[in-house]
UniProtKB/Swiss-Prot annotation:
GO terms for cellular component: cytoplasm. Transmembrane segments: none annotated. Keywords: Amino-acid biosynthesis, Arginine biosynthesis, ATP-binding, Cytoplasm, Ligase, Nucleotide-binding. It holds the Pfam family Arginosuc_syn_C. It comes from Cronobacter sakazakii (strain ATCC BAA-894). Pathway: Amino-acid biosynthesis; L-arginine biosynthesis; L-arginine from L-ornithine and carbamoyl phosphate: step 2/3. Its EC number is 6.3.4.5. SUPFAM superfamilies: Adenine nucleotide alpha hydrolases-like, Argininosuccinate synthetase, C-terminal domain. Homotetramer. It catalyses: L-citrulline + L-aspartate + ATP = 2-(N(omega)-L-arginino)succinate + AMP + diphosphate + H(+). This is Argininosuccinate synthase. ATP binds at residues 12-20, 122. GO terms for molecular function: argininosuccinate synthase activity; ATP binding.
Length: 405
């Protein structure tokens, strides 16, 4: 055992197997170290939070802070990213990626409160989360030391972790039968490992937690009305709700209809490909609602720019660069465009699908008089010829040059 000069460490604690083992490990390997557990409530399973403080104390923590960050998560992290339309590699709605900087910030706040000189996370050396946590801490609290047990200890399996806790009489609900690795918050739940480790294996039914199988969803479609103000969802079916409240309602409706499932192989930041089943029912509905309003109010160049902002934002958030200037710049760009993104969308949910079937906005650029396929008195078809000639001028010049050769 060594002292390492660390007197008090704040641990990102979940109550799961890994972080339950980290508490006694810290006390055994950092002599005289005081461990403060910090649980950040971002909408994970309520059962996981029951008794979590007592569990942390029984594992050896001197204190346990439970931070309710549910509204903050959706309002200050999810909504700004949603405005950009960010989808990592075209499909992932960044549920885990958006949560990590918030958790990291909450730990820094607790560290300042208790006078800690170190921070600790339970992310493995193979994953993205270690980068996200430590990049955030480098930006927010560069003076604090960082402890990453998975890069130090020799406990390399669930069996080893269970034996470690058993030898110290520390109770845990974990077992060898729980073969999946899951991450859950208000926005999504992810499932990895087990049968999913082979991309040739189809997911089992137990790979999905929130959503019903679309084949078993109701045979009748359901319509839901979503109200958007300046790029933020503010009401569902006419009822004004908080950001977290809107998501709660849409999660329930979407899950019932099997909405928001994806099964993907993604490129991790650390160079490994990983496979996961992700469920984001409410988020999928919100994304469809925002895109529906955008189609009405954004001109062609603005829409194209928003798509570029979303693509870049997906990588910035996924890579753990939340507190970097680029993320702030991208968010500012999206918020500027979102000033016009207000309206109402009716979406139809049916067996896993979300379809915007009605949309309106006072800022709409859609004009029926111009768009009609019938006879109109506002559009002179002869004007199109000059536009096309100028638009295709470079192609015409290139072709003429080729004829001269």
């Amino acid at each position: 055992m060594q002292n390492h000069g660390i007197k008090k460490v704040v641990l990102a604690y979940s109550g799961g197997l890994d972080t339950s083992a980290i508490i006694p490990w810290l006390k055994e390997n950092y002599e005289g170290c005081d461990v403060v557990a910090c649980v950040v409530d971002i909408g994970q399973d309520r059962d996981d939070l029951k008794g979590v403080e007592q569990k942390a104390l029984r594992s050896g923590a001197s204190e346990c802070y439970v931070v309710d960050a549910r509204e903050e998560f959706i309002k200050d992290y999810v909504y700004p990213v949603l405005q950009t339309g960010a989808l990592y590699e075209g499909s992932y709605l960044l549920g885990t990626s958006m949560a990590r900087p918030l958790i990291a910030k909450a730990l820094v706040d607790v560290a300042k409160k208790v006078g800690a000189d170190a921070l600790c996370h339970g992310a493995t050396g193979k994953g993205n989360d270690q980068v996200r946590f430590e990049s955030a801490w480098a930006a927010l609290a560069p003076h604090l030391k960082v402890i990453a047990p998975w890069r130090e200890w020799n406990l390399r399996s669930r069996e080893a972790l269970l034996d470690y806790l058993k030898a110290r009489d520390i109770p845990t609900t974990a077992s060898l039968e729980k073969i999946y690795s899951r991450d859950e918050n208000a926005w999504h739940i992810s499932t990895e490992g087990g049968v999913l480790e082979s991309p040739w294996n189809a997911p089992n039914q137990d790979c999905w937690v929130w959503t019903v199988d679309p084949k078993d969803a109701p045979d009748e479609a359901e319509q839901v009305t979503v109200t958007v103000e300046k790029g933020n969802v503010v009401a569902v079916n006419g009822e004004q709700l908080t950001p977290f409240g809107c998501l709660e309602v849409l999660n329930k409706i979407g899950a019932k209809h099997g909405v928001g499932r994806i099964d993907i192989v993604e490129n991790r930041l650390v160079g490994i490909k990983s496979r996961g089943c992700y469920e984001t029912p409410g988020g999928t509905i919100m994304m469809a609602a925002l895109r529906g309003v955008e189609q009405l109010v954004l001109d062609r160049d603005s829409f194209k720019w928003r798509e570029q902002v979303g693509l870049e934002m997906s990588y910035v958030v996924y890579d753990g660069r939340w507190f970097a200037p680029l993320r702030q710049s991208l968010q500012a760009a999206a918020q500027s465009l979102a000033e016009q993104v207000s309206g109402e969308v009716v979406l139809e949910l049916y067996k896993g699908r979300v379809t915007a079937i009605q949309k309106k906005s006072t800022n709409s650029l859609y004009n029926e008089e111009f768009a009609t396929f019938g006879e109109d008195e506002v559009y002179d078809h002869s004007h199109a010829g000059g536009f096309i000639r100028l638009f295709s001028l470079s192609s015409r010049i290139r072709a003429l040059n080729e004829l001269k050769k």
